[in-house]
Amino acid sequence: MKGLILVGGYGTRLRPLTLTVPKPLVEFGNRPMILHQIEALANAGVTDIVLAVNYRPEVMVETLKKYEKEYGVNITFSVETEPLGTAGPLKLAEDVLKKDNSPFFVLNSDVICEYPFKELADFHKAHGGKGTIVATKVDEPSKYGVIVHDIATPNLIDRFVEKPKEFVGNRINAGLYILNPEVIDLIEMKPTSIEKETFPILVEEKQLYSFDLEGFWMDVGQPKDFLSGTVLYLNSLAKRQPKKLATGANIVGNALIDPTAKISSTAKIGPDVVIGPNVTIGDGVRITRSVVLCNSTIKNHSLVKSTIVGWNSTVGQWCRLEGVTVLGDDVEVKDEIYINGGKVLPHKSISDNVPKEAIIM
């Protein structure tokens, strides 16, 4: 089987982290985000994976090629000279995706969930249509494009309603699909939207179905959702692979901690915390609902809450970081500083408080 991951472009919503590496290489749960997807595809029997890239492809190639052997897959990079939207990349990768005439998976690189690829493939083959969208249920469907089903045929999609003012359903497109190769014939080699241009044709032909996703789902393409997705991911690990989570007298709730991290016995970590390789946590530090990326240091008696601490950064003593603060690569926060919702660009030194949301350049 084959799969295409829409890696996309600049990752502006996740800046300042994406000023240093492309978004799919930002570590989520201590692994590059895209590795969660590559591993799930490989586990479902996918042997050919296409990464549709239009930003810094050379970095992606250098980082990901080494994983081919580990996961037993062929990784091809389909490089767009101009952004082609969500459908154009399928046309660009037509040679790989049409190989052996079997269905192929498509997924957005921002999506984190318990990828149900095997079940999705079985469901797709059983209904015999040309395409299947994975759907997830949401509490506030008025914020999204909602899937409405055909009354007579379960799971057959009748139409999409964009941001409905009245309740028509609570299932939305989760950004994971399986499609038959002939769907590529509906796509032109130009910037095209699969959601707005390709799927409506399949709906008209009564060839598009939806598959309900079980478990958690999150688009982690911006800091607030990255942190929310981390909470959901750790909850999922606690159920499926609890041995991966840290335990100890100073651990509260779910925490994923790299074994090379050095943490003071008087620090308190958790709930909902990820700590990367070679991180140092000082005495009396308190960290909740946060991610600390590799080679960073949190000095004594600081509070880190709802924050992403970027690589190689230092947080001084008696600091308080909260409110979805994001430190870029190699940031230094001086002692006794308060940051509330600051987005700090790489290589900055912060010696003044940031009491409200701001971009520090």
Swiss-Prot record:
One GO BP annotation is: protein glycosylation
- Predominant cellular place of this UniProt entry's protein: cytoplasm
Q: Which residues carry this modification: Phosphothreonine?
A: T153
Is Transmembrane helix there in the keyword field? no
EC no. given is 2.7.7.13
**Domain of life according to the entry:** Eukaryota
- Catalysed transformations (reactions): alpha-D-mannose 1-phosphate + GTP + H(+) = GDP-alpha-D-mannose + diphosphate
| Classification via SUPFAM superfamilies | Nucleotide-diphospho-sugar transferases
Pfam families according to UniProt: GMPPB_C, NTP_transferase
Extract one GO cellular component term from the record.
cytoplasm
Q: Where in the cell is it found?
A: Cytoplasm
GO MF annotations, alphabetized: GTP binding; mannose-1-phosphate guanylyltransferase (GTP) activity
Q: What pathway annotation does it carry?
A: Nucleotide-sugar biosynthesis; GDP-alpha-D-mannose biosynthesis; GDP-alpha-D-mannose from alpha-D-mannose 1-phosphate (GTP route): step 1/1
Task: Keywords in alphabetical order, please.
Answer: Cell cycle, Cytoplasm, GTP-binding, Isopeptide bond, Nucleotide-binding, Phosphoprotein, Transferase, Ubl conjugation
Q: Where is this cross-link: Glycyl lysine isopeptide (Lys-Gly) (interchain with G-Cter in ubiquitin)?
A: K244
What the entry lists under InterPro entries is as follows:
GMPPB_C, GMPPB_N, Hexapep_transf_CS, Mannose-1P_guanyltransferase, NTP_transferase_dom, Nucleotide-diphossugar_trans
What else is on record for this protein? Answer: Present with 97100 molecules/cell in log phase SD medium.
PANTHER family per UniProt = SUGAR-1-PHOSPHATE GUANYL TRANSFERASE
> What's the stated role of this polypeptide?
Involved in cell wall synthesis where it is required for glycosylation. Involved in cell cycle progression through cell-size checkpoint.
Protein family: Belongs to the transferase hexapeptide repeat family.
> What is the official name of this protein in its record?
Mannose-1-phosphate guanyltransferase
Gene behind this protein: PSA1
